[in-house]
């Protein structure tokens, strides 16, 4: 019980800090503008762009937090399980993310080794994989690549998201699925990272009784490996 209370206090403290940071930045920028009698148009536009970015960041943090809270309260009987063509879903995800990849000069590749149909919550699975691919794009390098691979056997389907990005230090790997953890806070701020995307992805995958692993080499890239059962069986019905 003490550990739970401590964990809750740490989470609330982190939430408070993360929500205050963009507001503090907006306040500083606004105060700076108001203290100037004659603001050059270019400087005004620059400050307003920064304020807009901070508002977007605050909004993203709130949306991610609401999603996590909703998932924490979601029981298995509230999962909208249906048969989904995973190949088609991955194609849609990459199609939506191509404009972001193009801006970062990152190539997106989908390799479907076989056709896969599985029992999943379509919306939640799409969210999890989108977070993984979007991270791979954001933390990549110029002229980099993200390869998404889909395979399956008789029991599970497997998704790998591999990038040629900046990589993750070994001592950070065990923490990357923690809420609000960011390897490079400066880079996360630059690309709009909230430190919640991977926590959401892991939560979704675990709700499907799956697992997610990560391998990374600094300066070479990162690979996230996901394994999810083809047939969803509620835990109360699963055999011990």
Residue ranges and their predicted role:
Residues 73-79, 117-120:
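Conserved micro-motifs of the catalytic ATP-binding
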Residues 209-210:
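Conserved glycine-rich
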Residues 80-83, 102, 107-117:
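Conserved catalytic submotifs in the C-terminal HATPase_c
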Residues 143-155:
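Short beta-strand/loop element within the Bergerat-fold HATPase_c
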